[in-house]
Amino acid sequence: MDKVIATPGGTNEIIRKYNLKLHKGLGQNFLIDQNIVDKIINTADLNNEDIVIEIGPGIGSLTQKIVPRSGRVFAFEKDKRLVKVLRELFNGYNHLEVIGQDVLEVDWKHFFDSRGISDRSVKVLANLPYYITTPVIMGLLESNITFSLMVLMVQKEVADRMAAAPGSKDYGALSVAVQYYGEVEIFHKVPPTVFIPRPRVYSSIIKIKPHSEPVYRVKNEGFFFKMVRAIFQQRRKTLKNSLTKSSEIKLDKGIVTEAIRELGLDPRIRGEKLTIKQMAILSNTLWYKISEEDGENHEIY
């Protein structure tokens, strides 16, 4: 494909040629601004040794710039019509594999092992449909695969929540979950006018750099994330009330009071004020105390 895809003319030409009807249920919004494409590519800092996972390539607006700059590219597209379009448009690139699969169903360890890929050399790029943003990102981060980095276009409000600092209005369970696994940066705000069709909201380009080693050591991740959800379930409650009255996790008031005191926290503090490190320590302290009551020996990190 010689013509630039990420322009109004290039995009409409492909839509007409293949008689494409955009699928609202799949959140299909195609990029038509080459400057935005370049910002994504530049943020990813691609080189010809990189292995790239592209999620939701659509008609190839981003793919067109990824392929010449990467060693191998795996593009996951759920819409079978667009899989055919992509394979025709990029049939000259042997290092590109277009995979017609829902990315939420991918077993990443099996995928990498079957292709002899080292996860540390993999970058993830995507213009993510809004409706699958959180499950896709959390699925990648929770996969125990250490991706090199992720550069993603997401809804602005979601980006703000992912990057939010403790005590801010956007700080919540999603902030903690994403930042638990990696560093988050917001690079650019993107208007609706750079898409066909136009979404109703602004987007942001974010970069997530997963931690190569755990930064926050928690004894039991399942318990930790239940505690986090409980903390943010009713933001206006004190930390103690959140942990003793939530439907997520109901802890003994005495244990919670004792743990808060041991951590040197104000007993009236709201959970939304805690840093992730403080939450990790609190989680380990509570887990230890619960285990003591159960007669088990659980080490605190």
From Swiss-Prot:
It comes from the Bacteria. Keywords: Cytoplasm, Methyltransferase, RNA-binding, rRNA processing, S-adenosyl-L-methionine, Transferase. It is found in: Cytoplasm. One of its GO terms (cellular component) is cytosol. Coiled coil: none annotated. Its EC number is 2.1.1.182. Its main location: cytoplasm. One of its GO terms (molecular function) is RNA binding. S-adenosyl-L-methionine binds at residues 29, 31, 56, 77, 102, 127. It catalyses: adenosine(1518)/adenosine(1519) in 16S rRNA + 4 S-adenosyl-L-methionine = N(6)-dimethyladenosine(1518)/N(6)-dimethyladenosine(1519) in 16S rRNA + 4 S-adenosyl-L-homocysteine + 4 H(+). Pfam families: RrnaAD (PF00398). Disulfide bonds: none annotated. Specifically dimethylates two adjacent adenosines (A1518 and A1519) in the loop of a conserved hairpin near the 3'-end of 16S rRNA in the 30S particle. May play a critical role in biogenesis of 30S subunits. Belongs to the class I-like SAM-binding methyltransferase superfamily. rRNA adenine N(6)-methyltransferase family. RsmA subfamily. PANTHER family: DIMETHYLADENOSINE TRANSFERASE (PTHR11727), DIMETHYLADENOSINE TRANSFERASE-RELATED (PTHR11727:SF7). NCBIfam families: ksgA. This is Ribosomal RNA small subunit methyltransferase A. It comes from Halothermothrix orenii (strain H 168 / OCM 544 / DSM 9562).
